[in-house]
A protein has these predicted regions:
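Catalytic palm subdomain of template-directed nucleic-acid polymerases
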Residues: 1-4, 22-27, 59-63
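Basic, alpha-helical interaction scaffolds
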Residues: 36-117, 172, 180
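Short amphipathic alpha-helical coiled-coil/interface segments
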Residues: 74, 126-137, 203, 236
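Acidic, serine/threonine/proline-rich low-complexity intrinsically disordered regions
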Residues: 116-124
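Short, charged alpha-helical motifs in flexible N/C-terminal segments and linkers
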Residues: 7, 16, 132-194
Length: 248
């Protein structure tokens, strides 16, 4: 019906099917091999991973494949700026290097990650990679304490950068009153499950962590984008400043 309404042509050669299951067991093998899916008299094979909207979804490795794709894209973007003065032998200003990295490279690293439900281990992979890049750009020792790295760089850790983008995405959903995502958010947050791992419940945990209003309240009364962004930025900066200062 969607294809007929919007005049969309489906090409079987471009289809990619990925089967997700909690355990890679015989049941998944049965679903993918014994029950094939046909389109235009052709069998659509199942893949271990597929790309959608710039993100790679994997049936075996969770979000790690998408994260590694973002790290590789960030590395390519960073290397493309080396001739502009970021290379070590250019002896460029570390502060300028950090600023250029923040403007041109950080968005590439964080692109799409805010929409994923990341585990603590996956967030740690991103944080360690980002911290290592800061150390190299500022020419610091590898054992430099975290507070010194982020205070000298004048930037937030990768985890905080990710939280900022998650709040921005959630605020956008709050203003989409008739959108299916808004309805799913209200439905998900109205029923509270213990240790729920959904994306919207992660937003609720982040609101509690930073002392923000409950996300269900914001869905019913969406704050203005500018005010909400300033409030989130202020709360996140305050939280991480106290955390890093206490660790120093």
């Amino acid at each position: 019906m969607y294809c007929v309404k919007y005049d969309v042509a489906l090409v079987s050669e471009k289809f990619q099917l990925v089967a997700f299951h909690k355990k890679m067991d015989d049941e998944l093998h049965y679903e993918t091999s014994v029950i094939p899916i046909h389109f235009n008299d052709q069998v659509i094979p199942f893949s271990n991973q597929a790309s959608h909207l710039g993100l790679v979804r994997s049936a075996e490795h969770g979000n790690l494949v998408s994260i590694m794709e973002r790290l590789a894209a960030h590395r390519r973007q960073l290397f493309s700026l080396l001739p502009a003065g970021l290379a070590f032998h250019h002896c460029g200003n570390p502060a300028a290097n950090i600023r250029v990295q923040h403007i041109y490279c950080l968005p590439v690293l964080m692109s799409g990650l805010a929409s994923l439900v990341l585990s603590k281990a996956e967030i740690k992979v991103i944080s360690n990679y980002y911290k290592t890049n800061l150390i190299k750009q500022m020419k610091l020792l590898h054992r430099t304490p975290d507070p010194a790295i982020y205070f000298l760089a004048g930037t937030l850790p990768a985890e905080a950068q990710l939280h900022l983008r998650q709040f921005t995405l959630f605020n956008m959903i709050c203003h989409l009153k008739q959108n299916i995502l808004n309805k799913v958010a209200v439905s998900s947050l109205s029923v509270s499950y213990y240790k729920s791992t959904s994306w919207f419940h992660q937003i609720r945990y982040l609101c509690q962590q930073y002392g923000l209003f409950d996300p269900l309240i914001m869905l019913n009364n969406p704050p203005s984008k500018g005010h909400f962004k300033d409030q989130c930025r202020s709360k996140i900066y305050e939280y991480w400043h106290k955390k890093l200062t206490s660790e120093a």
